Amino acid sequence: MNIVITGGAGFLGQRLAKALLHGSCPLAFDTLILADITPPPAPQPDARLQCLALDLSQPGAAERLIDADCGVLFHLAAIVSSHAESDFDLGMQVNFDATRQLLEAARHRAPGMKFIFTSSLAVFGGELPPVIDDRCAVTPQSSYGAQKAMCELLINDYARKGFVDGRVLRLPTISVRPGKPNKAASSFASGIIREPLHGKQAVCPVDAELALWLSSPAAVVSNFIHAATLPASAFGALRTLNLPGISVRVREMLEALRAVAGDAVAARVRFEPDAAINRIVAGWPGEFDTRRAQQLGFTADESFEQAIRTFIRDDMPQGGG
C-alpha cells in the first residue's frame, strides 16, 4: 500500500512525512510519495520514500501520483489565502481544478482509497453564529474560501457515490509555524510569536481583540494520521470535520508570549493595522463546537502557552529570546 502527500515540500508535508516514517506510526505502508511543484527534500533517509517534482495543475499529473496501489492520499497542496485572492486564475487551477483531477484519478485508478483533504476556516465568513459546528453552512468571503468550499462539497459527493473514502479536515490556523512568513492572510499568527523569539521585530496587522482558532503543528499532524486510521463508518454521511483547536485573542497570544519568554521579547511586536488582512481574518470564526471530532479521538493543544513551548523545544534548539 502506498501513501501520497501533495504539498510534500511544504512545512506541514515535511512534518507529516517524518511522522509517517517514524517507527511508532500506526499506518503500515510500502511506499511514501512526496510530491510538490519543487522537489521535496527527504525528511530522513528511508528506502520507502520517493520524492517527485510535479505540477498538479498540468494534465496527467494526478495519474502519475495515483495508481491501484495507492491507499491514502493526504492532499495538502494549495495556493494560500491572500495569494489566491490576488491571483484568481492560479488559485482556481491549484486549489480547485487540481483537486478535481486528483479525485477523478482516484475514482478510476484506486476506487475507495482514503482521500484526506485539508480545508480551512476560510469556508466561513460574513454573519455567523457565535459558535460554529460541522453542520453550519459554508459562507466564504474570499476566493480561497470559495475554492476550499467547492472542494469540500465535491469530496462529500465522491464519498457518497463510493468513488473515494473522503475525509475533509478543516484546519485551525496553525501557530507557531517555523520558517519565513508566507502570503497567507494568517501568516502574522505565527510571525508575532516566531520573530520576537528569534530576536526580530514583528508587525501585527489585526486588532488585538480579534479571536483566532489555533492549533500547533504537532497537534495538526497527529490529527492527520488519526484521520487515516479511522474506518469510513466513523464519519457517516457527513465527511467534513472541524478539527479541535483553542480560541485565543491576539492580545492573549502576546500575553502567552510574555509569560513564556519575558517582557523584552513581547515588546518586539508592534501593531500596524492592515485593513485588507483584518477584513479577511475577522471574517473567520473564532470559536467552534468540535465535540464530534473529539468523540472520534481528534485532539487539541492544552493552551497557547503550551504551543509556544512546543515550538521552542522542537524548532529552536538553542531556546528563545
Feature-to-residue mapping (PLM):
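Conserved Rossmann-fold NAD(P)-dependent oxidoreductase catalytic core, especially the SDR/UDP-sugar
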Residues: 100-141
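Active-site Tyr-X1-5-Lys
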Residues: 126-128, 141-167
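NAD(P)H-binding glycine-rich loop region in Rossmannoid oxidoreductase-like domains
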Residues: 56-94
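Mid/C-terminal beta-alpha module of Rossmann-like enzyme folds, strongest
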Residues: 196, 223-278
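NAD(P)-dependent short-chain dehydrogenase/reductase
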Residues: 156-211, 217-219
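Amphipathic terminal alpha-helices
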Residues: 271, 285-295, 302-321
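Substrate-binding strand-loop-helix patch
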Residues: 180-185, 208-222, 237-257, 310
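N-terminal Rossmann NAD(P)H-binding glycine-rich loop of SDR-like oxidoreductase domains
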Residues: 3-24
